[in-house]
Amino acid sequence: MLFRSGLQDPTGRIFRLKPDGALDCFLGGIPSPNGLVLNKDESILFIAVTRGNNVWRAPIMPDGMPSKVGVFIQLSGGGGPDGMALTADGGLVVAHAGMGSVWVFSPLGEPLYRVRCETGITSTNVAFGGGQNRDLYITESESGHILKARLPLPGLALPHLV
């Protein structure tokens, strides 16, 4: 998947590269698409919509196109969602640029935890690692730091590509 947004096109789009090599628009009309993450079975794409200050949920049909796209999580405050990751149980972890926080949501979108970044307000990305995959690494671009928080639940292990 590719995404594109900017001054030349304020409505943002996400493109997909099909197995036959053709590139087509997966979804358009998105106010600043940013972080993208697929659920474990790759049937749902979550999209951090920075300018809308929300996260969209896009179920993917068998033909590879989205269906019934809508707001999954509405955030508040300055900035908006940026990078994301998944917990092992299908919850969503969202870096909130402009608020200096990372939010951990249940698979149903309920807020479970808030991790505050003490070094700045521009938390931009997240990734799991460490023992039992419970360490959450957070990039904070205002200060240039990489922070680590130990969570009570593990992150989804990413498949290793060979």
Residue ranges and their predicted role:
Residues 24-28, 66-74, 113-116, 157-162:
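Beta-propeller fold detector
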Residues 16-20, 103-113, 121-122, 128-130, ...:
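Flexible "stalk/tail and boundary" regions
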Residues 3-5, 50, 60, 97, ...:
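Short loop/turn segments immediately following the C-termini of beta-strands
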Residues 58-65, 150-159:
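Short loop/turn segments immediately following beta-strands, especially the blade-tip
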Residues 3-4, 8-14, 23-44, 74-92, ...:
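Beta-rich, blade/repeat-based domains predominating
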Residues 12-15, 54-56, 101-103, 145-147:
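A short loop-to-beta-strand structural motif that recurs across blades of beta-propeller domains
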Residues 53-69, 73-111:
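Loop/turn-rich, solvent-exposed surfaces of beta-rich toroidal or solenoidal domains
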Residues 8, 21-26, 45, 52-55, ...:
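Short, structured loop/turn "capping" segments at alpha-beta junctions
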